[in-house]
Design a protein with these regions (language model features):
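P-loop NTPase catalytic phosphate-binding loop
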Residues: 1-193
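Conserved AAA+ ATPase small/helical "lid" subdomain
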Residues: 191-201
Length: 201
C-alpha cells in the first residue's frame, strides 16, 4: 500500500472495531513515515484517548514532539491549544514571506502529523475543543499540518466541515453495515473476517 498524505490527503479518517488491527496500522504507518523522513522534516503529535497504550512505542521516536492521553485531560487541553497556536504561527511565517504554501518557503517548518486515536472519545470528553481541529482540517494542507483521526465507530463522529477535508478513508472491520456505509458508501467492511486483522478498504 502506497499512500501520500500530501497528494491524496491531506487528512485521513480511519475506522475499525476492537481487534481489527487499527492500532497496529497506525503504528506501522507512522514508523514508515519516520523511516523515510528525518525529524527535521517530519514531526508527530499523538493524542491517545484510550488510556495511553496505542502510541507508547512511538513516543521514543525523535520525530515525536508531543504525546498526551485521556488520563490527563488538562494536558490534552494544553496540547490542543498548542496545536492551534502552531497553526497561527505557521500562518504568520507564510505571510511574512508571501508564501501560499510552506513548500514555497526557503526554510519551512517540519511537516506536523497529528494522530488521534479514539476520536469519538475526544469529542465526548472535550467537545469545545473539536472546532480547533476543524480549523486545522480546513487550513492545514498549505501549512504542513495533517490529521489522522481514528475511531471505533465512524457514525456521526466527524462534522461535515471536517469530513469535507478528509480525502483519505481507511475502513478496517467494523461492527455493522451502517458503520461501513458511513465511510465507504457500502457495507463490505462489516464482512471482513475477524481472523484477518489489518484487512481494510
Amino acid at each position: 500500500l502506497m499512500l501520500d498524505l500530501n497528494r491524496q490527503g491531506p487528512h485521513a479518517l480511519v475506522a475499525g472495531t476492537t481487534g481489527s488491527g487499527k492500532s497496529v496500522l497506525l503504528q506501522s504507518w507512522c514508523l514508515a513515515l519516520a523511516s523515510m523522513n528525518g525529524p527535521e522534516h517530519l514531526n508527530f503529535v499523538f493524542l491517545d484517548f484510550k488510556g495511553g497504550s496505542a502510541f507508547r512505542k512511538l513516543e521514543r521516536l525523535p520525530h515525536t514532539v508531543g504525546s498526551v492521553c485521556d488520563l490527563d485531560l488538562a494536558h490534552a487541553v494544553r496540547a490542543l491549544r498548542a496545536l492551534e497556536a502552531e497553526l497561527t504561527r505557521r500562518e504568520q511565517l507564510s505571510a511574512a514571506v508571501h508564501a501560499s504554501d510552506i513548500r514555497d518557503m526557503v526554510n519551512p517548518p517540519p511537516r506536523l502529523i497529528v494522530v488521534i486515536d479514539e476520536f469519538h472519545a475526544l469529542k465526548d470528553q472535550l467537545p469545545d475543543y473539536v472546532n480547533r481541529l476543524v480549523r486545522i482540517a480546513s487550513l492545514g494542507r498549505s501549512l504542513g499540518m495533517y490529521l489522522i483521526a481514528c475511531t471505533q465507530n465512524p457514525m456521526g463522529q466527524v462534522s461535515a466541515d471536517m469530513k469535507a477535508n478528509m480525502s483519505v478513508s481507511i475502513c478496517l472491520r467494523v461492527r455493522d453495515r451502517l458503520q461501513s456505509c458511513e465511510l465507504l458508501g457500502d457495507g463490505r467492511a462489516a464482512d471482513l473476517s475477524p481472523a484477518m486483522p489489518g484487512a481494510a478498504f
